[in-house]
């Protein structure tokens, strides 16, 4: 059988890539082109019939050559896979002693990588040969250079990416300095039960923080005017952290489906962490999380700026509000620029603990320049402005130390600012401490992880791992807790009795009524009252005299009348805020246009015109409505033509009685008694006077025509 195989080889070998059975060919394998010989012969010991096949089969052993586990390993591999060929001796295989020396030097790495040593290269099968032959081992020393100590080479091995963590090219993956390599998923530091506990903890905290920040934002929506500058940035700050909490809650619901790549059994690839922006879902989570995290921090800095402008520079709320456009440009522009820069640099990384995607989880440089540095700058600037504002407020408190009430208010405000700032700064400074601690110890943790899994993954073990340290789960839980709890500090600012009252009114539907709507309601009720009452009066006219329902006005002068001449037009009747009866009565009867204006203003109405509209379009379609409005228009016309309103003196007050609102029945012109009170021509001259409506004790005089009437 062996003879038959040899004959077939002799027949078909010349047709395989131009190989000849008894001729040498130039070496084309790049790895072996630097050997002392430049001609080879095939088939080799492993029955490879061309150099391309031999080069492919030699690749699994190249890590031994790269690590230089033996100074002669590369020469041995080339002699085994690409044997030397000379004119005198067709094939020069590696010698047995040479094989034993190389194998003993590289045995540890062979076991580490889990390599399968070819049976054809077992040293027992090789022959002893004369090492003085020129084509053997001596010339090779000219190409290897100075030999290195095996133990010294082993210390410089470094990290080799395990086979199941390798990724396809073009994705930009890089793990522990090795390209096309990704971190394992689930997390490389913790066990499965620890990860489940951490995920549940993050989910609960995210829900709590989401509810707190939403409560702050909804409180703002209930009463927008309550939160003006300088405290308006608190609302935007709470909105940012509500989005951050929502992203962590979504990551809790998704688990590892977004932050990790699924295993590929065909390619023998395991679960790996997502690196880069190729995964759309992970990229979206990263954009929202990083953008609003940075924006929330910037809004806190803007809050300290507005406080400083108000306390230190004595800016008013309106002056600060004029700079709102610049505040928004900075608060949204800087995080947006950083987010776009990270996307362009392909620095998105999946977090297999929380389920979200962020930056700097495995790349220390990205964490240092895009997370740690911006947070440190914000803390420094915000704390400096905050201290400057508090010093200014303390100076103001010392100036007004004799004003006990204002000093107490200012003291409470300073305490409120201090507590709020502490609730924000303490978690943020703790978070910065976690990031700094992680920066210092990350390399040691990674070396320890490689040392723990090198035999399992068949990769070189790090000999420099003298002290093995592993991260504590509590450190990561504190980091996530401080990231989320920062947003809860906004609840302290809105937490007050006023907030409780607003929420109670919101749920009970007892909000404050609009003054304009309230005045319209009063006018509508007045018109409805006149409609009902006027119909009764018309019905009773058959039985009563016209003068029996006449009303008279008593004007009690407070000594403010300065006019010297009598007013032959309509006299102005002033209404004070304390005379509610006079306000309601005069509003209903509208004696003159001037009094109508005053009365409508006192009741919160806009103009007499709106009142005429309410009367012109009553809710009831009865015929009495039109008659009422006609009579009111007629009365105003007569008043404008010169009808005088006559007041009864203080001495006759005992002869009358105060008329309630329901007793007003007559819509005709007012009749006077025998006394006249001189009025001023200026409307403001009667300010402070009090008006009362009484029935005449002695009956009214007969009405005159529509012409002018003057009293003597």
Curated annotation (Swiss-Prot):
Cytoplasmic topological domain: 223-233, 306-324, 392-416, 495-712
An example Gene Ontology biological process: canonical Wnt signaling pathway
Processing after translation: Ubiquitinated by ZNRF3, leading to its degradation by the proteasome.
GO molecular function, one term: G protein-coupled receptor activity
GO CC entries: apical plasma membrane; cell surface; cytoplasmic vesicle membrane; endoplasmic reticulum membrane; plasma membrane
Membrane side Extracellular: residue ranges: 19-201, 255-284, 346-370, 438-473
Pfam families linked to this entry: Frizzled, Fz
InterPro entries: Frizzled/SFRP, Frizzled/Smoothened_7TM, Frizzled_dom, Frizzled_dom_sf, FZ6_CRD, FZD6_7TM, GPCR_2-like_7TM
Subcellular location: Membrane; Cell membrane; Cell surface; Apical cell membrane
Keywords: Cell membrane, Cytoplasmic vesicle, Developmental protein, Disulfide bond, Endoplasmic reticulum, G-protein coupled receptor, Glycoprotein, Membrane, Neurogenesis, Receptor, Signal, Transducer, Transmembrane, Transmembrane helix, Ubl conjugation, Wnt signaling pathway
Coiled coil: none
Domain of life: Eukaryota
Compositionally skewed regions (Polar residues) per UniProt: 668-693
Domain FZ: 19-132
Annotated spans, Disordered: 588-712
DNA repair as UniProt keyword: no
Lys-Thr-X-X-X-Trp motif, mediates interaction with the PDZ domain of Dvl family members, short sequence motif: residues: 498-503
Membrane topology per record: Multi-pass membrane protein
Compositionally biased tracts (Basic and acidic residues): 628-637, 652-664, 700-712
Leader sequence residues: 1-18
Positions of glycan attachment: 38, 352
Main subcellular localisation: membrane
Transmembrane residue ranges: 202-222, 234-254, 285-305, 325-345, 371-391, 417-437, 474-494
Disulfide-bonded cysteines: 24-85, 32-78, 69-106, 95-129, 99-123
Family designation: Belongs to the G-protein coupled receptor Fz/Smo family.
Entry protein name: Frizzled-6
Gene name per UniProt: FZD6
């Amino acid at each position: 059988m062996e003879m038959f195989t040899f004959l077939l080889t002799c027949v078909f070998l010349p047709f395989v890539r131009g190989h000849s059975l008894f001729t040498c060919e130039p070496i084309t394998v790049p790895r072996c082109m630097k050997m002392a010989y430049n001609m080879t012969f095939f088939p080799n010991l492993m029955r490879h019939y061309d150099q391309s096949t031999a080069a492919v089969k030699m690749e699994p052993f190249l890590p031994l050559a790269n690590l230089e586990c033996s100074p002669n390993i590369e020469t041995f591999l080339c002699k085994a896979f690409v044997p030397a060929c000379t004119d005198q001796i067709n094939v020069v295989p590696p010698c047995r002693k040479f094989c034993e020396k190389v194998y003993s030097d590289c045995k540890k790495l062979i076991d580490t990588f889990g390599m399968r040593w070819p049976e054809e290269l077992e040293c027992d099968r090789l022959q002893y040969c004369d090492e003085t032959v020129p084509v053997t081992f001596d010339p090779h020393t000219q190409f290897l250079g100075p030999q290195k100590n095996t133990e010294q080479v082993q210390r410089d091995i470094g990290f080799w990416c395990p086979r199941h963590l390798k990724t396809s090219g073009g994705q930009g993956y890089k793990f522990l300095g090795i390209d096309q390599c990704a971190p394992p998923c689930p997390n490389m530091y913790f066990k499965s039960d620890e990860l489940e506990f951490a995920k549940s903890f993050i989910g609960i905290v995210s829900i709590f923080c989401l509810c707190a920040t939403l409560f702050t934002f909804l409180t703002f929506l209930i009463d927008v005017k309550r939160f003006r500058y300088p405290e308006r940035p608190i609302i935007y700050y709470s909105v940012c952290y509500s989005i951050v909490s929502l992203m962590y809650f979504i990551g809790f619901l998704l688990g590892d489906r977004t932050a990790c790549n699924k295993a590929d059994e065909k390619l023998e690839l395991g679960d790996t962490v997502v690196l880069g922006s190729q995964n759309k879902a992970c990229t979206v989570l990263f954009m929202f999380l990083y953008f609003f995290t940075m924006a929330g921090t910037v809004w806190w800095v803007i809050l300290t700026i507005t406080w400083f402008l108000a306390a230190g520079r004595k800016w008013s709320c309106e002056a600060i509000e004029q700079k709102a456009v610049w505040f928004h440009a900075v608060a949204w522009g800087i995080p947006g620029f950083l987010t776009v820069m990270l996307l362009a640099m392909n620095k998105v990384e999946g977090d297999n603990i929380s389920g979200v995607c962020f930056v700097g989880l495995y790349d220390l440089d990205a964490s240092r320049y895009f997370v740690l540095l911006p947070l440190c700058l914000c803390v420094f600037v915000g704390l400096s402005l905050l201290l400057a504002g508090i010093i200014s407020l303390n100076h103001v408190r010392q100036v007004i130390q004799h004003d006990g009430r204002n000093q107490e208010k200012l003291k409470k405000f300073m305490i409120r600012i201090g507590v709020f700032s502490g609730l924000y700064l303490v978690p943020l400074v703790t978070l910065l401490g976690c990031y700094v601690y992680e920066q210092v110890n990350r390399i040691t943790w990674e070396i320890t992880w490689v040392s723990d899994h090198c035999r399992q993954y068949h990769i070189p073990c790090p000999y420099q791992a003298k002290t093995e340290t592993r991260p504590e789960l509590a450190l990561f839980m504190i980091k996530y807790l401080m990231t989320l709890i920062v947003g809860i500090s906004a609840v302290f600012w809105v937490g007050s009795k006023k907030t409780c009252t607003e929420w109670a009114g919101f749920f009970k539907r007892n909000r404050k009524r609009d003054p304009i709507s309230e005045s319209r309601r009063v006018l509508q009720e007045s018109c409805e009252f006149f409609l009902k009452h006027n119909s009764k009066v018309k019905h009773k006219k058959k039985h009563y005299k016209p003068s029996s329902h006449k009303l008279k006005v008593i004007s009690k002068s407070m000594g403010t009348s300065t006019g010297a001449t009598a007013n032959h037009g309509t006299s102005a009747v002033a209404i004070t805020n304390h005379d509610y009866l006079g306000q309601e009565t005069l509003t209903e009867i509208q004696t003159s246009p001037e009094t109508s204006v005053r009365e409508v203003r006192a009741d919160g109405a806009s103009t007499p015109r709106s009142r005429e509209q309410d009367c012109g379009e009553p809710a009831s379609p009865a015929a009495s409505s039109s008659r009422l409005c006609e009579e009111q228009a007629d009365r105003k016309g007569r008043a404008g033509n010169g009808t005088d309103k006559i007041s009864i003196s203080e001495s006759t007050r005992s002869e009358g009685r105060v008329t309630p609102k329901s007793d007003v029945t007559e819509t005709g012109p007012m009749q006077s008694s025998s006394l006249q009170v001189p009025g001023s021509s200026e409307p403001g001259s009667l300010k402070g006077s009090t008006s009362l409506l009484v029935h005449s004790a002695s009956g009214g005089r007969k009405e005159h025509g529509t012409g002018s009437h003057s009293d003597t």
